[in-house]
UniProtKB/Swiss-Prot annotation:
Keywords: DNA damage, DNA recombination, DNA repair, Metal-binding, Zinc, Zinc-finger
Purpose of the protein: May play a role in DNA repair. It seems to be involved in an RecBC-independent recombinational process of DNA repair. It may act with RecF and RecO.
Gene3D superfamilies linked to this entry: 3.40.1360.10, 6.10.250.240, RecR Domain 1
Protein name in the entry: Recombination protein RecR
Origin organism lineage: Bacteria, Pseudomonadati, Pseudomonadota, Gammaproteobacteria, Pseudomonadales
Taxonomic source organism: Pseudomonas fluorescens (strain ATCC BAA-477 / NRRL B-23932 / Pf-5)
NCBIfam families per record: recR
Length: 200
């Protein structure tokens, strides 16, 4: 089926979203145009406002509408802990754990094949933040448990050696409520390697 230029433009724009392929983009576009024009206009307005008004926190680099995000602006947070994550969504995930320290958001992970080296993801800015803040006693590396995430954590840990900081890595393993037979071998290996004695 051949679409008009404006419909084609809408479909192509929707395909830029993660996980949205050609067919899904077509369904979304036609749904908005045929059945939910007011929803489409709200979406366009919200998207336009977000693109104009949302930037990056000057301290941790997460997404925010203000100069400082709510976490960096909160004076009650623990200034001795710094959690390093790969992206803004990770901040929201870590917040759900009750973590009350500070954050630094990388722009992804090291991936030489994709041209993402230390500068591209913000490692020099991370080191500068640690140096300037001066109050951190522990840096928690909460990068994803992928090959690239592990490499990124290892690289940062090496850079922080001899800086007088505790450098820790979040644990990876069997999810709470998970069944061992359903857990992949790599995750199970991490669980065994990170096992701890039971305190009675």
């Amino acid at each position: 089926m051949s679409f008009s230029p404006l419909i084609r433009q809408l479909i192509d724009a929707l395909r830029t979203l993660p996980g949205v392929g050609q067919k899904t983009a077509q369904r979304m576009a036609l749904q908005l145009l045929e059945r939910d024009r007011s929803g489409g206009l709200r979406l366009a307005q919200a998207l336009s406002q977000a693109m104009e008004g949302v930037g990056h926190c000057r301290q941790c680099r997460t997404l925010t509408e203000d100069e400082l995000c709510p976490q960096c602006a909160d004076p009650r947070r623990d200034d001795t802990l710094l959690c390093v994550v790969e992206g803004p969504m990770d901040v929201y995930a870590v917040e759900q754990t009750g973590y009350r320290g500070r954050y630094f958001v990388l722009k992804g992970h090291l991936s030489p094949l994709d041209g993402l080296g230390p500068e591209a993801i913000g490692i020099p800015q991370l080191l500068a933040r640690i140096e300037e803040q001066g109050s951190f006693s522990e840096v928690i590396l909460a990068t994803n448990p992928t090959v690239e995430g592990e490499a990124t954590a290892h690289y940062i840990a090496q850079l922080l050696t001899n800086k007088g900081l505790i450098t820790s890595r979040i644990a990876h393993g069997v999810p709470l409520g998970g069944e061992l037979e359903l857990v992949d071998g790599g995750t199970l290996a991490h669980s065994f390697a990170g096992r701890k004695p039971i305190a009675l």
